Amino acid sequence: MLLSSSSSSPTNFNPNATYPRISKFAYLDPLELVIGDCEIGRLALVAPFAVCRGDEGTPIHIGDYSNMQDGVILHALETTSHGKNIDDRRYSAEGSLLKANNSEFKNGFAIYVGDKVSLAHGVQVHGPVYIGNDTFVGMNSFIFNANIGKRVAIGVSSTITDGVTIPDNKFVPPGSIIATQAQADALPPRVGSPYEKINSAVLHVNQELAKGYDARIIQRLATEIEGELEQEEMLQTGSPTGNPNVMARR
């Protein structure tokens, strides 16, 4: 449910104001901030103080069932300037880094966060970045200019940058700095690591929270609308409806 958002501001690199596109089945906390060209999928959860700024590098995609936990920041380097595309600033939905003259550039993403991805508290993702499905990014980690594969587990306070690609099914130990492809290729497997099953547990919790918070908000809105309708009826008829819930709220 979309609760707090705004359009981007027109600039020489993004001349058109763009509003976020949010699934009606996503949950966004009232204290989040989503600006501009951000797309958030079904049963995604955006927690308090999380920020998605689709006002410079665009667009930003957050897949179905993914979660942005408290204090997560998503932002990206500009993808176009004065109407011209910029090399290596967008990824395809399949994870290919795109050149400016690639016909797929217009359909690419400054940040692509796949389905069932967990971005834990305080994570910063600065595009160009690609994160594959079913990946966990641990608390206070930083990802900039990197391609993260599927089913990867990234330990807390890690840094991944300088154009590296983390292969599928890898484990990034806590506190790691991965800035060369040789470091990325030498990472151990996720299976058998302390983080082997962490994402499934985190996904379960956040999907339940998304459904629960959405249901609670819908019920509250329904109750408020019912009350407003009954108050309007009272004004028209001059007599109370007798609904004890409405009477109790007055």
Name each model feature, range by range:
Residues 47:
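Small cofactor-carrier domains centered on a conserved lysine used for covalent cofactor attachment
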Residues 2-21, 55, 59, 63-64, ...:
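Glycine-rich hexapeptide-repeat left-handed beta-helix
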Residues 1-43, 51:
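Extended, small-residue-rich solenoid/repeat segments and analogous flexible loops
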